[in-house]
UniProtKB/Swiss-Prot annotation:
InterPro entries referenced in this protein's UniProt entry, alphabetically: MoaC, MoaC_bact/euk, MoaC_sf, MoCo_biosynth_MoaA/MoaC, Mopterin_CF_biosynth-C_dom
Biological processes per GO annotation: Mo-molybdopterin cofactor biosynthetic process
Encoding gene, per UniProt annotation: moaC
Record-level Gene Ontology MF annotations: cyclic pyranopterin monophosphate synthase activity
Role description: Catalyzes the conversion of (8S)-3',8-cyclo-7,8-dihydroguanosine 5'-triphosphate to cyclic pyranopterin monophosphate (cPMP).
Species of the source: Natranaerobius thermophilus (strain ATCC BAA-1301 / DSM 18059 / JW/NM-WN-LF)
Membership in a protein family: Belongs to the MoaC family.
Protein name in UniProt: Cyclic pyranopterin monophosphate synthase
Length: 159
């Protein structure tokens, strides 16, 4: 694992990393996060009773769109041809939260960690936006890379 910043040149200026010499490999990243809310808000989302509509359906589309646009949103990310995006939601009624998971796949020269993290972030933000009219206490927490595979660093588990 490299202990230096690859996005800085020898003068400390930001640059986009050259990846042309890297081999194409199968890449996969799993990101996770949670949004906490009041119990009645969670129930309305679960039963699809929110005034703005299907919260998780819209959040799923937002996650997919955000994942695909990561290269436009984060300055030093390469635009990637993604081969698969999966978005999963899990209701945790005991802790009044929705757990979000985004799995991204590609075959290419660079990883898809930022894409997975962006997907989780946008799903959580979309849920927040669609529920904020009835719940001003929501919290988005624990957005993290859970797993990745492929490339020079191989398999990484972060949970």
């Amino acid at each position: 694992m490299v202990d230096e910043f690859t996005h800085l040149d020898n003068q400390g200026k930001a640059r986009m990393v050259e990846i042309n010499q890297k081999p194409d490999t199968s890449r996969r990243a799993v990101a996770r996060g949670s949004i906490y809310m009041k119990a009645n808000t969670l129930q309305k989302v679960k039963t699809n009773e929110m005034e703005k509509g299907d919260v998780l359906g819209v959040a799923r589309v937002a996650a997919i769109m955000g994942t695909k646009r990561t290269g436009d949103l984060i300055p030093m990310c390469h635009p990637l041809m993604l081969t698969g995006i999966e978005v999963n939601f899990n209701f945790d009624e005991e802790n009044c939260k929705i757990d979000i998971e985004v799995i991204v796949k590609t075959t290419g020269k660079t990883g898809v960690e930022m894409e997975a993290l962006t997907g989780v972030s946008l799903a959580a933000l979309t849920i927040y936006d669609m529920c904020k009219s009835i719940d001003k206490t929501m919290k988005i927490e624990h957005i993290r890379l859970a797993k990745k595979s492929g490339g020079q660093s191989g398999e990484i588990e972060n949970e």
